[in-house]
Every structure is written in structure tokens, then in C-alpha cells.
Amino acid sequence: MKLRQVVLALGIIGLFIVILLNRHQFVTFWHLLINIKLYYLIAVVIVQLFSYYLNALYYRSILRAFKYEIGLMRLFEGAMSSNFVNYIFPTAGMGGAVFLSQVLKPEVPRGQGFLTQIMRYVLSSIAVAMFIPVSILLLAATDHSDATVFEGVIVAAFLILTVGIIIYKLVRNEKLVRRLHNWLSLKFHFLKSIGSKSFADDFYSGFHEIFGNVRTMFVPYVWSVTYIVVEVFTMYLAFLALGRVVNPGIVLMGYIVANISSVFGGAIISVGAFEVSLTGILVALGQPFAFALSVTLIYRVLNMIIGLPPGFIYYRKYIKKTA
């Protein structure tokens, strides 16, 4: 069986497993529709699709820094398909990075395509950290301040920052990374597509170009910040759909905590880490459990309905390019 057929089969199996694991959420979501203001749900769909477009704008901005010009529609497809891969294959985002490099070839070398997605994670993490004091100030202005929650978020953010610094230091050790890269490509034959010497050469070419002129990352960073604002707004629409107006700090803190949790949980399982942490933090910030769970279901189920089917279609489209 060819590699393309194997990867496609894995994608279908993964999609089936995700649907199976989330079947109760879809049933509960269906019952929630009775009490939901549908025009807010329509707004969620539109805004969520717009967030994928923002990802495409991010990709275009960083690729232009590398002197590559790729069409926005293709980048939009890359955003949806790499998100599908990240959801189906829990690899802490690495699967999506590898797949994006597949979408961008042959115009963009695989190593730089991989780096494009990695920098998205880096810039998004910096943006999330920037919003932590904003959420704390918003919550402190009302009766939702909770020292334990704040301390937990700050500690988690510090851990992510520490891990990020360690990874950055390791990546700068080019000799060590090249040895690891060669070992992985020899040990695991399915990594053959990223196992060539040119992959590492292209990756470090882009890496040195970025950190040799950090100012080129300003526009990609702005798109990363804009993306987070839109995602938080999408979550806020879920509150409005259930007829409740809340302090934006609650929504922002919920988004931050859920994303921090998914960073640590994403290497093990793509289903559950975000949902459990979002529901938990909303309850900790004073929202009734039933309401917090309903908001989480609306946000995540719509996210899956909007992202997974077209993501699978684009995943299948670009799998055909697999060598």
C-alpha cells in the first residue's frame, strides 16, 4: 500500500474516532439548540471561518518574509487541513506543521514550510502571554478576582515560557538538532519526506533569516494577536447565544487557560483537554456548571462542525501530493 493511501486511511480512522468520542457532545448540542438564539450561532460560523482566513493572512505575511508568494485560497486550505491534522493526530502541533509543509511544496522548501507553522505556534504563545495581564485587570475590576486562579494561570504561563526558552536554546544548537533529525529519519521510515539533509538546511536557512532580522515578524505577530481577539469574540458569541452577557475577562481567561491546557495535553490526546479546562475555569470564575458546559459545547461542537469536514476534504486533496 502506498504512503498516500496509508495516510488517507489514518485520517479517515482518526475522524471516525473523534466523532465517536464526541458523540455525546453532538447529542447534547442538539438539545441545546432549543434554547439558543440562532442568529448568534450563524455569527459564530461566520466569525470562525474568518479566523481561518486570518491564519491564511498570517501564512502569507511570514512567507513573504521568506520571499515566497502563495495564493490566499491555498493558504486558507492549508490552515483548515493542518488544523484537521492537529485535531486527529495528537502530536502537540507537529503533525500540522509537517502537513503544512506538504501543502506549500514545491514552491516553498519543506524545511521552511515546517518553520512557518512552528513560528505560528511561537507567536501565538507570545500573544496569549500578552493577554494574561489584560484578563487579570478585567476580572479584578469586578467581583470575579480569584487569587488561586490567577496564580495558577501565571505559573502555567511561566512553565510554557520556560519550555519555550529551552526549546529555543536546543534549536539554536544546530549540530545537536541535525544529529536528532538524521537519527529520526533513519529510525522511522515514514519520516522520509522530512528526512533529507535539505530539510534541515532549509529549516535553518529560514531560522537564521528570522532571528537575524526579528522585525520581519512584526506583521505575522499582528495577525496572531488579531486571530486570538477573533477567537475570544467567537467564544463570547457562545455566551450571547445562551442569553448571558458576562465580563469579557471571564471569556479571555477561559480561552487562555484552555489553550495552555491543550498545549500540555495535545501531545497525548486532542480530545478533552481543552473542553475540561474551559469548563473548569468558567466554573471557578463563578459561572454555573450547566451553563459553563453549555458554552463549551457550543464553542467546540461548532468548531468541529465548521473545521473538520472541509479540513478532511483539503487533507485528502493535499495527501495526493505525497511522494
Regions found by a protein language model. Give the residues of each.
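Re-entrant/interfacial helical elements at transmembrane boundaries that shape
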Residues: A92-P106, G266-A284
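Helix-coil boundary and interhelical linker segments in multi-pass alpha-helical membrane proteins
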Residues: A141-S145, L240-V246, G286-F291
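Transmembrane alpha-helix interface/packing and boundary motifs in multi-pass membrane proteins
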Residues: S82-P90, Y255-E275
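Predominantly cytoplasmic-facing regulatory/coupling regions of multi-pass membrane proteins
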Residues: M1-M80, A147-V263, L302-A323
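Transmembrane helix-loop junction
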Residues: R64-A65, Y87, P106, L137-A140, ...
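Membrane-interface alpha-helices at helix entry/exit sites of multi-pass transporters
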Residues: M73-E77, T91, G95-G96, P106-V122, ...
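Membrane-embedded alpha-helical segments of transport systems
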Residues: S81, V85, F89, F114-L137, ...
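Short intracellular "coupling" helices and adjacent cytoplasmic loop segments at the cytosolic face
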Residues: M80-V98, F207
